[in-house]
């Protein structure tokens, strides 16, 4: 399915050791050897942060001869005051790092992979018509002509084929934290961006789209790469003067990660709406990140008969459902493809957020609540404890 996840056999919560600061992955979680995400205490100043990073580099330099190969502090981030960095350390050094009183916690970096896509050849796409009608079976997508104009959508994914005709020149390349290839060699990112803002396949047909590549052509990456992309997008939104008028779609996730959840929460606090796929494991989404992060809009997948998709995650952290089974959208090379997954559901909501921001002037911090307010109670088979709300754009269509 289209959901991008952390490859693991267990989604149990990370155990906490070393006075609550050095987190350890459970057996079965696929960690990057000797690689970590270091998160600083709230309120640490830029000067204190730089002092710590210099100290960490010196500590690492003194101990790396014990094992070799580790590179020390790497990319750093500052997401709305959440400061930290990714690093490659030996065991002795990481314990020293965790003991620093300015460090909040250290978490192992983990691998991110794409799950297999479910493809139905030449299947019709029904998602757009469904979100503009209070009843199932509609064939037309009805929307206001503002169509997300003036709103920026960041696609944090495998990249975007920005030259695809479905974007009509509204897509641009932002950054790449995954590799040195500024293309979408996977297709997932182009599909999700098209669902959010494509001229033919998208919800917000006039919104701008920015590619934030955090996963490679094979759909693989790390939490640290994803967080680096989120950090870049928040800073770019501020530089554009688009705070409160920006949307981020993350059709990815996996095993619970405190660092990922903290980063996601800070994205929202910074003034960027964040739509997140609930996951495709048919389990409680509270076990997944960033689906379980506070203040994000967590989206489950529905079918064209208003059922809860068999694969979708569920539970109290789900804010609403959106179409996620057999969704057709743009694909690299100028064509289109039909895919299924909560990855397909989340960008419907990202597009709806951009649509309502342009139409009603809703700010990013209020967008999820407004979307839930407009949603209709149509999901007949929602698991116990899960909302029955389905995305609706509020247009007066039947």
Curated annotation (Swiss-Prot):
GO terms for cellular component: extracellular space. Active at neutral to pH 8 with casein as substrate. The active site is at residues 157, 188, 343. Residues 124-134, 163-170, 227-245, 310-318 are annotated as: IgE-binding. GO terms for molecular function: IgE binding; serine-type endopeptidase activity. Keywords: Allergen, Glycoprotein, Hydrolase, IgE-binding protein, Protease, Secreted, Serine protease, Signal, Zymogen. One of its GO terms (biological process) is proteolysis. Inhibited by phenylmethanesulfonyl fluoride (PMSF) and diethyl pyrocarbonate (DEPC), but not by benzamidine. CDD domains: Peptidases_S8_PCSK9_ProteinaseK_like. InterPro entries: PCSK9_ProteinaseK-like (IPR034193), Peptidase_S8/S53_dom (IPR000209), Peptidase_S8/S53_dom_sf (IPR036852), Peptidase_S8_Ser-AS (IPR023828), Peptidase_S8_subtilisin-like (IPR050131), Peptidase_S8_subtilisin-rel (IPR015500), S8pro/Inhibitor_I9 (IPR010259), S8pro/Inhibitor_I9_sf (IPR037045). The keyword Disulfide bond does not apply. The record marks 280 as: Important for catalytic activity. Its main location: secreted. Residues 35-113 form the Inhibitor I9 domain. It is found in: Secreted. It is an enzyme of class 3 (hydrolase). Residues 20-115 form a propeptide. Residues 1-19 form the signal peptide. Its EC number is 3.4.21.-. Serine protease. Hydrolyzes casein, gelatin and human collagen type IV, but not elastin in vitro. Hydrolyzes OCLN of the human lung epithelial cells at 202-Gln-|-Ser-203 and Gln-211-|-Ile-212. Belongs to the peptidase S8 family. This is Subtilisin-like serine protease Pen ch 13. It comes from Penicillium rubens.
């Amino acid at each position: 399915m289209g959901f991008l996840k952390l490859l693991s056999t267990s989604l149990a919560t990370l155990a906490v050791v070393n006075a609550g600061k050095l987190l350890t992955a459970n057996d079965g979680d696929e960690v990057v050897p000797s690689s970590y995400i270091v998160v600083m205490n709230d309120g640490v100043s830029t000067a204190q942060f730089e002092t710590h990073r210099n100290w960490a580099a010196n500590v690492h330099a003194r101990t790396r001869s014990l094992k070799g190969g580790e590179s020390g502090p790497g990319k750093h981030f500052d997401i709305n005051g959440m400061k930290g960095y990714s690093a490659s350390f030996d065991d002795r050094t990481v314990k020293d790092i965790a003991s620093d009183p300015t460090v909040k916690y250290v978490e192992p970096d983990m691998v991110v992979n794409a799950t297999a896509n479910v493809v139905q050849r030449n299947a019709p796409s029904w998602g757009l018509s469904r979100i503009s009608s209070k009843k199932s079976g509609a064939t037309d997508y009805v929307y206001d002509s503002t169509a997300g104009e003036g709103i920026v959508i960041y696609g944090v994914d495998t990249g975007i084929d920005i030259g695809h005709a479905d974007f009509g020149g509204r897509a641009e390349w932002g950054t790449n934290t995954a590799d040195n290839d500024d293309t979408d060699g996977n297709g997932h990112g182009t599909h999700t961006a098209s669902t959010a803002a494509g001229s033919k396949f998208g919800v917000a047909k006039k919104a701008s789209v920015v590619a934030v590549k955090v996963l490679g052509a094979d759909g693989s990456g790390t939490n640290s790469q994803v967080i680096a992309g989120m950090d870049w997008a928040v800073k770019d939104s501020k530089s554009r003067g688009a705070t409160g008028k920006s949307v981020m779609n993350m059709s990815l996730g996996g095993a619970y990660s405190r660092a990922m959840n903290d980063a996601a929460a800070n994205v929202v606090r910074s003034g960027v709406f964040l739509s997140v796929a609930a996951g495709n494991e048919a389990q409680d989404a509270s076990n997944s990140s960033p689906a379980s992060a506070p203040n994000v809009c967590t989206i489950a997948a529905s079918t064209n008969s208003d059922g809860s998709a068999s694969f979708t995650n569920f539970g109290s952290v789900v804010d609403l459902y959106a179409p996620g089974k057999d969704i057709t959208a743009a694909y690299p090379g100028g064509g289109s493809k039909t895919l299924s997954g909560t990855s397909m559901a989340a960008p419907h909501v990202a597009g709806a957020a951009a649509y309502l921001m342009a139409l009603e002037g809703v700010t990013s911090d209020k967008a999820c609540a407004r979307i839930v307010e407009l949603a209709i109670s149509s999901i007949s088979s929602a698991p116990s404890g899960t909302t029955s709300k389905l995305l609706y754009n509020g247009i007066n269509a039947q």
